[in-house]
């Protein structure tokens, strides 16, 4: 995999002014982004998140998943901490792409869960890869992290790449009547570390 740094710019947000760093994967043509806030010290554990692209949740405010809620909460937590990072990876639909994600949603509308839908389309439950994060982390100068995630695969990926995960911080937000089944499947079939008793915030109607 060949990840090339392209450019950086300021990104004003409701939670503060982040710096946006652009990267290109010359093998796939995909473009990834790292957001950083504050002064980052390689010798200090930095609060952060690996976030896979979710157009429906991040930009279209879908209640079918918890992705948009997690992204916003992560950015808010980083702003409150005064420093941190988000690696925004272009792996829509756990790696199957947007149109296949819509096809999977169609199957879910007919009763399949999120894993069954992917498998009926001929895909694994989760196709995401995380090897691109190492050059991104090296560029922004982070070696130790406090990782906001419920996904043990992300913790494992960072450790295998030589990045020290000092702490895993649960990020359980956004539960509502449209995504209860999805969240249960993520916990029971994808191994995400979640408990319904730990969700925060009001349920959406």
UniProtKB/Swiss-Prot annotation:
Enzyme Commission number(s) from the entry: 3.5.4.25
Q: Which GO terms describe its molecular function?
A: GTP binding; GTP cyclohydrolase II activity; zinc ion binding
Which biological process terms from the Gene Ontology are attached to this UniProt entry?
Answer: riboflavin biosynthetic process
Q: Which Pfam families match?
A: GTP_cyclohydro2 (PF00925)
Q: Which GO terms describe its cellular component?
A: cytosol
**Keywords attached to this entry:** GTP-binding, Hydrolase, Metal-binding, Nucleotide-binding, Riboflavin biosynthesis, Zinc
Q: In which pathway does it act?
A: Cofactor biosynthesis; riboflavin biosynthesis; 5-amino-6-(D-ribitylamino)uracil from GTP: step 1/4
Mind telling me what this protein is named?
GTP cyclohydrolase-2
- Binding residues annotated for GTP, in chain numbering: 49-53, 70, 92-94, 114, 149, 154
Q: Which family does it belong to?
A: Belongs to the GTP cyclohydrolase II family.
Note how many cofactor molecules are bound and how. Binds 1 zinc ion per subunit.
**Species in which this protein is naturally found:** Shewanella sediminis (strain HAW-EB3)
Q: Which residues form a coiled coil?
A: none
PANTHER family according to UniProt: 3,4-DIHYDROXY-2-BUTANONE 4-PHOSPHATE SYNTHASE, GTP CYCLOHYDROLASE II-RELATED
Q: Any idea which positions bind Zn(2+)?
A: 54, 65, 67
Describe its function.
Catalyzes the conversion of GTP to 2,5-diamino-6-ribosylamino-4(3H)-pyrimidinone 5'-phosphate (DARP), formate and pyrophosphate.
Report which superkingdom the organism of origin falls in. Answer: Bacteria
What enzyme class is recorded for this protein?
hydrolase
| Gene that encodes the chain | ribA
Cofactors needed by this protein, per the record, are:
Zn(2+)
């Amino acid at each position: 995999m060949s990840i090339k740094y392209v450019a950086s710019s300021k990104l004003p947000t409701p939670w503060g002014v982040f710096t946006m760093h652009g990267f290109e994967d010359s093998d796939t043509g995909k473009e990834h982004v790292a957001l950083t806030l504050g002064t980052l010290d390689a010798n200090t554990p930095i609060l952060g998140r690996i976030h896979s692209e979710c157009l429906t949740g991040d930009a279209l405010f879908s209640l079918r998943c918890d992705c948009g809620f997690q992204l916003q909460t992560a950015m808010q937590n980083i702003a409150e901490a005064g420093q941190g990072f988000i690696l925004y990876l272009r792996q829509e639909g756990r790696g199957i792409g947007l149109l296949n994600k819509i096809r999977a949603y169609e199957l879910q509308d007919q009763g399949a869960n999120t894993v069954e839908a992917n498998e009926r389309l001929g895909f694994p439950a989760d196709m995401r890869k995380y090897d691109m994060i190492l050059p991104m982390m090296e560029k922004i100068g982070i070696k130790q992290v406090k990782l906001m995630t419920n996904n043990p695969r992300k913790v494992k990926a960072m450790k295998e790449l030589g990045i020290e995960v000092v702490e895993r911080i649960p990020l359980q937000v956004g539960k509502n009547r449209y995504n209860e089944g999805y969240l249960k499947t993520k916990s029971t079939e994808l191994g995400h570390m979640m408990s319904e008793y730990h969700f925060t915030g009001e349920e959406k109607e």
